[in-house]
Amino acid sequence: MATTKSFLILFFMILATTSSTCAKLEEMVTVLSIDGGGIKGIIPAIILEFLEGQLQEVDNNKDARLADYFDVIGGTSTGGLLTAMITTPNENNRPFAAAKDIVPFYFEHGPHIFNYSGSIIGPMYDGKYLLQVLQEKLGETRVHQALTEVAISSFDIKTNKPVIFTKSNLAKSPELDAKMYDICYSTAAAPIYFPPHYFITHTSNGDIYEFNLVDGGVATVGDPALLSLSVATRLAQEDPAFSSIKSLDYKQMLLLSLGTGTNSEFDKTYTAQEAAKWGPLRWMLAIQQMTNAASSYMTDYYISTVFQARHSQNNYLRVQENALTGTTTEMDDASEANMELLVQVGETLLKKPVSKDSPETYEEALKRFAKLLSDRKKLRANKASY
């Protein structure tokens, strides 16, 4: 009798633990963040293609798309472009691009986007082709139509403030319901490389609202992971589906952050004697490069520390290549040879260990994430059916 009673107690303890775990997984906020980096966006595109393929395999559904699994997808610069591609709906209200379509997009359009304008007083590239192709691909779609919450950053040089385009901001700031092609060009309009972007929307009163925007990297310095987390936190507080989540409860956040590559020496190394001969333009190029790399490192350091402090280190995965060399470090080298190298970088990265202390490869970690994303989606669907 005592044995039976002990067994029943143990059974119900396991059942309670299992139910608690399922509830936590069901209420997890899933976040995808994609760095900026110009043509180096090919690297995270390879990672996204692998992840989407895993989700299709796990769920036995060739039509599965990343937007079906993430509550928030954030990006800056080229990461903002990827965000738009996988969240903007087509005529069937499905993402107009599958992850496997992104690399071919770079190969087809990259050489035209990064086609030197020949100007010695303006930006290196006139941006006309970039804006044209964005208009063709994204059409008249606006932020509110995105298939999941988005977080795309830019910076307004007239107001001197960051501008964050998200669906959840629209009730308070309807002027942020801009066309996706305007947002994508703005987040990619890196100073020196592309002209700033001017466009207008309207306020709730019908008044004209002006935007004068440059690259989102000015606002997030290349890595939008913290921005994406903050949007996810607000979403969790406002959406009844996440009622158990407290502010900044990273235990119930699942974050995948994709980099566009750097190296341990911040892309390039310089000596004091070398830098002493630089003029203003050379310094601007170097500072942008150094700042992006340093900020990306510090963002990763902060987020990983916070997740570890909350015993949730497995909820955060940063996928980054830290050993780029030669032309692969350049954000605007869209030669076919360099793009092929970037594809190789992404494919090789999948086979590399996540850290020096872990034998788990990025490929294995992404498979683990795919299983979590799939299980969570099924739990959500089961709850909705009751």
Curated annotation (Swiss-Prot):
A motif (DGA/G) lies at residues 215-217. It comes from the Eukaryota. Keywords: Glycoprotein, Hydrolase, Lipid degradation, Lipid metabolism, Plant defense, Signal, Storage protein, Vacuole. GO terms for molecular function: monoacylglycerol lipase activity; nutrient reservoir activity; phospholipase activity. InterPro entries: Acyl_Trfase/lysoPLipase (IPR016035), PNPLA_dom (IPR002641). It is found in: Vacuole. A motif (GXSXG) lies at residues 75-79. Residues 1-23 form the signal peptide. A motif (GXGXXG) lies at residues 36-41. The keyword Signal applies. SUPFAM superfamilies: FabD/lysophospholipase-like. Tuber. The active site is at residues 77, 215. GO terms for biological process: defense response; lipid catabolic process. Glycans are attached at residue 115. Residues 32-229 form the PNPLA domain. Its EC number is 3.1.1.-. PROSITE patterns: PNPLA. GO terms for cellular component: vacuole. Belongs to the patatin family. Probable lipolytic acyl hydrolase (LAH), an activity which is thought to be involved in the response of tubers to pathogens. The nitrogen atoms of the two glycine residues in the GGXR motif define the oxyanion hole, and stabilize the oxyanion that forms during the nucleophilic attack by the catalytic serine during substrate cleavage. Patatin have a dual role as a somatic storage protein and as an enzyme involved in host resistance. This tuber protein represents approximately 40% of the total protein in mature tubers. This is Patatin group M-1. It comes from Solanum tuberosum (Potato).
